[in-house]
Amino acid sequence: VTQETTVIIGAGPYGLAAATHLKAKNVPTLIFGKPLDFWKKMPPEMFLKSTWASLNIADPKNAYTLDAFGKKHQIVKQDPVALKTFLSYAQWYLEQVKLDIDQTFVKTLAQDGKGFHVELEDGRTVKAGRVLIATGVAPFPCIPDFAKNLPSTLVSHSQDHSDFLAFQGKKVVVVGRGQSAFESAALLCEAGAEVELIGRGPIVWIDRRLYRYTGFAKRIFYPPSDIGPAGISWLVAFPQVFRRISDQRRTSIDLRCVRPAVAPWLRSRVEGRFTTTPNTSIVEATEQAGGLDLKLSNGETRQVDHIVLGTGYQPEVETLTYIDPALRSQVQKYHGYPVLNEWFEASVPHLYFSGALAAYNFGPICRFVTGSGAPARQLARHVAAGL
């Protein structure tokens, strides 16, 4: 290991794509993390909101796509795509690209002269000339104020559960109104829980008529990346272009693309199965007799056994406490996101971010698997040019 080594922290789609592109340019690279760990912890019976065409983990030759996997294993296109299918594809991708992944987690990341010092949880240390942080969304669950001081026995985030069997016969409130909230509510019902979903705004079902009924012409409205409403999705598909528009316009587009909304295929699993209370929020939650007493913004109250938060994620650099405080303080930020240049490089030279943490500059595509290509290509070009 030398100062020419690039370290990648995270072995999800973005970390894997970056490592594959660096390998193609013969850049010495170490990647740390458990491959697809976040995805493997999801309930196995889940389906994904992303479409088949937008679930490709990027590689330099575009050879290891979900289509290629499907043809190899005689798997027809799925709508929706099952989580199990995506995980099988990801495993096949790993077998093709042959990355040497160290499944040890990083304990600390600090500056060391012009490079970086990485300490691993097993006590080993590594020197690196460049570091890519590709940690996905798992470190960033959004926890509402009312829930921050409640014990994990009474409140949990949707990402905490690989199944909901423990809630059979329990009264559970799901907070949220997007895909994760509705899918959690559906799985809770199927596990035998009594469920109510409470969302602070209206319930929005994604309207896919233009996508479904225009045949080949759908590509006029939607690129293969398929993030956001018709038309806007073409701008979102090009993160380097997105980066160049004004802050105000970027924020407006981002809100339109990632607003809480539910995929239409989930409708048959949820309608009539549980109570939905839209345009309402929980004002206060207090422990009472092994459960929770809830006060709602509409003046009503509830007594429940547990709350599941389907409230999404809020990426912030400061949440990544393994980054040395002195290093974190040097990273220029905007509302918690690192401010990045065209190479996905932060204000600290040779420190890069991809995935959800890149969304402020490069847009909502960074929150989805389909966005893994742009940072991988840019990082590989920038690093290779500097060696």
Enumerate the language-model features and the residues they cover:
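Flavin (FAD/FMN) cofactor-binding and adjacent substrate-gating region
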Residues: K40-H73, F221-R243
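Flavin (primarily FAD) cofactor-binding/catalytic cores of flavoenzymes
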Residues: T2-L36, K40, Q78-Q179, E183-L387
